[in-house]
Amino acid sequence: MARWVEPGELPGLVEVELAADGLFEQVGIVFPPGTTMIEEVTDPSAVLVEGEPPAGFALIGWVDGNLHLDQLAVHPSRMRQGIGGRLVAAVRDHATASGAPAVTLTTYRDVPWNAPWYARHGFSVLPEAEWGPELRALVEHERELGIEVAPRVVMRMVVAGRMMAD
């Protein structure tokens, strides 16, 4: 069951992130060197985890009034056990409880465990014309960091009965 991370568990999530990122080498994607996203977390209320000790995590924030899934990582040794799906469900539930109309994310379009996986879990591609200013800035920031080494898409899962007007 997904839960909020305990502050003392954050350092252990670095191994989860690095191991999950290593899978991308199978499809020719190598991330630029540097600190992991989880190492930059200062607020434990931005991280949901699954497992004891955590085998996966969801790092969340707010972008244009939507809950944004900054990263979802599951240790490869624990993949295909429903951990990612439970984390996405917990993110969706948190978005609903917080009054967010949707959950957004950016991901690789053609990596099987990225956009196609998210589509099976309720996300759909969000056309660029519908991106808000913060989402546009986030995508540009990812490009500057060198993350866009393969085609990427923005996806959204509507969690409220209808999207709120801008």
Give residue spans per PLM region:
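Conserved GNAT acetyl-CoA-binding A-motif
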Residues: 95-108
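Active-site acidic-Proline motif in GNAT/NAT acetyltransferases
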Residues: 75-77, 81, 109-110
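Acetyl-CoA-dependent GNAT
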Residues: 4-77, 88-89, 94, 125, ...
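Conserved active-site tyrosine of GNAT-family acetyltransferases
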Residues: 118, 123
